[in-house]
């Protein structure tokens, strides 16, 4: 769930303005480098999909901008979600990032101008029930695999003695766990549709399964939870493989919804309660 990249930008105080500017600059530089390396590898979607120099230039700038905002800014602000003033946090601001992604997708689609929106998003009405079934199976099995992989990673790190036991649940996670069910459903709905449209429907066909999954994991860096990143990368690979097999975004949307729904509605509240009981 991309819930706090733009939220942090809204809550930067005057004392942290210079640091924020440097983070933004670094994010743009990383994005420029990434797009340049992709171009050297022959991946230039702004050239291949857009007609005319002006449209190609605008598309390239859009790509650099969205990668800077959605992927690399969270990397440069690793762990800063803990610094958000939760008392001042306005719920609709959590969806700002999804609005930005939506605007990007619509602008890119308009710059192309040669394909329907449904085709651009890899959506069709054929085999609806089979896609829904596949999505539910992928989401459920993805949870099992993610728990196994994350547990194995945590166990391996614990064996080395390099992982300090956390003293408390991150405040942002407690805040999310205590949200009303309706708000949680809104977050899930935004994440399952917009994030899948961007990372799977847009990025994966253009940069590949592995790199789009890496980008998806990087977009969650601001939470400052390394094992969460492992889990996000794992489920992204699994959902991405489903997209590669079906060529349709709907199973991915359903799988993402199942995964985030279980996480927000069941696992996270349970984990917060269990941690509170253990500490008490």
Whereabouts are the PLM-identified features?
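N-terminal, membrane-interfacial amphipathic/helix-forming hydrophobic leader that caps
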Residues: 1-130, 155, 261-280
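Extended, compositionally biased low-complexity polar/Lys-Gly-rich tracts
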Residues: 100-104, 136, 141, 185, ...
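Transmembrane helix-loop-helix hairpins at the membrane interface
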Residues: 7-13, 25-37, 143-151, 163-280
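"…centered on the first transmembrane helix and the immediately adjacent amphipathic helix/loop
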Residues: 114-172
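Short alpha-helical transmembrane interface motifs in multi-pass membrane proteins
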Residues: 86-90, 101, 134, 183, ...
């Amino acid at each position: 769930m991309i819930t706090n990249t733009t939220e942090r930008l809204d809550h930067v105080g005057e004392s942290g303005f210079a640091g924020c500017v440097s983070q933004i600059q670094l994010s743009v530089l990383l994005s420029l480098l990434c797009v340049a390396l992709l171009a050297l590898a022959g991946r230039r979607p702004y050239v291949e999909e857009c007609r005319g120099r002006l449209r190609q230039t605008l598309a390239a700038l859009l790509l650099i901008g969205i990668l800077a905002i959605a992927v690399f800014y969270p990397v440069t602000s690793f762990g800063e979600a803990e610094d958000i003033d939760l008392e001042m946090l306005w719920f609709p601001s959590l969806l700002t990032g999804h609005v930005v992604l939506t605007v990007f997708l619509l602008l890119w689609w308009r710059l192309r101008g040669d394909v329907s929106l449904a085709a651009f998003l890899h959506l069709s009405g054929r085999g609806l029930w089979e896609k829904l079934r596949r999505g539910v199976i992928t989401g459920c099995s993805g949870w099992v695999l993610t728990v196994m992989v994350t547990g194995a990673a945590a166990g391996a790190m614990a064996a080395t003695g390099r992982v300090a036991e956390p003293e408390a649940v991150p405040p942002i996670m407690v805040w999310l766990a205590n949200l009303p069910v309706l708000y949680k459903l809104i977050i899930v709905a935004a994440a399952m549709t917009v994030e899948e449209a961007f990372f799977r429907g847009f990025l994966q066909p253009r940069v590949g399964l592995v790199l789009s999954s890496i980008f998806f994991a990087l977009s969650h860096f601001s939470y400052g939870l390394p094992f969460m990143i492992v889990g996000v990368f794992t489920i992204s690979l699994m959902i991405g493989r489903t997209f590669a097999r079906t060529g349709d975004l709907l199973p991915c949307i359903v799988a993402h919804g199942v995964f985030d729904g279980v996480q927000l509605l069941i696992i996270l509240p349970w984990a917060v309660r269990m941690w509170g009981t253990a500490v008490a």
